[in-house]
Amino acid sequence: MRILKIIPQAFYTSRGTPLSAYHRAKELEARGHEVDILTYGVGEEAPDLKARVFRSIGPHFKRSIPAGPSRLKIWFDCLLFMNLLLRLCLRRYDLLYAHEEGALLAKLAGAIFRIPYVYDMHSSLPLQITDWKFSKRRSVISVFRWVERQSVRGACAVVAISPAVERAARSVCPTARCVVIVNHFETSNDVSADEAANLRMKYGIGPQHKLVLYTGSFVALQALDLLLESVPRVLARVPEAVFLLVGGSDPEIAELRAQAERLGVASSVLFEQMQPQRAIPAYLAAADVLVSPRVKGINPPGKLLPYLASGKPVVATDTLVHNQILTERCAILTPPHAAGFAEGVVAALTDPERVAKTLAEATQVVASYCSPTARDAAYADVIAAASAAGRNRNVAAAAPNGA
């Protein structure tokens, strides 16, 4: 099948929706489909991807775009839609595969060119407006609720990245054809002991230290302030603990470093800029504990399954963003506050019996979401829905009144 993926993001970057979209493209390619990508005019070159990447042309005004909703993003989406129409004039596709609000663009363009679309739903659009503090105005939230409703109802299939996202789609349209495909970022876990030791040495972390690692974006939604507030409590009981946070920009790191200094823990907290995805397995191998302090949202962090597959204990807040994937059997779940999170980290560092039990179950959770058989079946369901929708549109077009 010839597929045009619509990615309303700075593609490529090694986190969030762009990273999810990248791996979706690779999985579609691996299943024999021809994939083109249409995205914003900003972003990096994607590694090891067969797909052709077409970037929006037009006045973008900025060379980068922040994560989350913004007025600039709305303008970028307008440019993306004009470029989508142009692309569809130049080439025929069997399916439009759209991420996030790109589904509305796909619905409009698909109606003109008689092409079905799949909505890859990463979260609830109106919920993002409030979680990212873009606007509190009811009129603005209502507009995004309408966009989500139109996107779900018109899609031949909705690919939800988690069970909670699937529930959000069905709340909009109970009859929607939904398939849950949890983000699974394929990386090699074949990291030698020497590589892990060298990475620890790079940051001055000796064998006597216990390394607590966070990887991912540093946006406020990730609740890294909560993580830092937990550090003094952890150090009071495990003074050899060291925290390494990987994935920030210089301004983000400066802000969090200032918080660490105010808390008096700057000497025990290290920061690193965003790293390429291929480098992350070495960080996971070097760590003693992996953490995810996020509280808000319904879209699980993409790091969860790589965390579980790493063979290291995982500590996360016991909130919907995590507990739709994680349970107390495969991870250490904590109340969503600093004191509770600190207790979880301390348990991961000092309770080997509990850790052993979670690691055994983590392997089963990864297998349930990431087995080739399960993912093949999920993608086959999506493609079957797209094929059926394409046939129906062709029949309608061939009917006497179909034109």
Model-based region annotation:
Residues H23, M82-C89, L104, L108-I112, ...:
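Membrane-proximal helix-turn-helix segments that form the acceptor-binding/catalytic region
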Residues D48, V191-I205:
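A short helix/loop element that forms part of the nucleotide-sugar donor recognition site in Leloir-type
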Residues E353-A384:
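A charged, aromatic-enriched C-terminal amphipathic alpha-helix characteristic of glycosyltransferases
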Residues C156, A282-N299, K312:
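Acidic donor-binding loop of glycosyltransferase active sites
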Residues E328-A339, A347-E353:
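Conserved acidic donor-binding segment of nucleotide-sugar-dependent glycosyltransferases
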Residues A164, H184:
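Carbohydrate-associated surface elements
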Residues I74-L79, P116, L127-S151, E195:
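Nucleotide-sugar donor phosphate/pyrophosphate-binding loop at the beta->alpha transition
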Residues A254-R278:
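Nucleotide-activated donor-binding/catalytic signature segment of Leloir-type glycosyltransferases, i.e.
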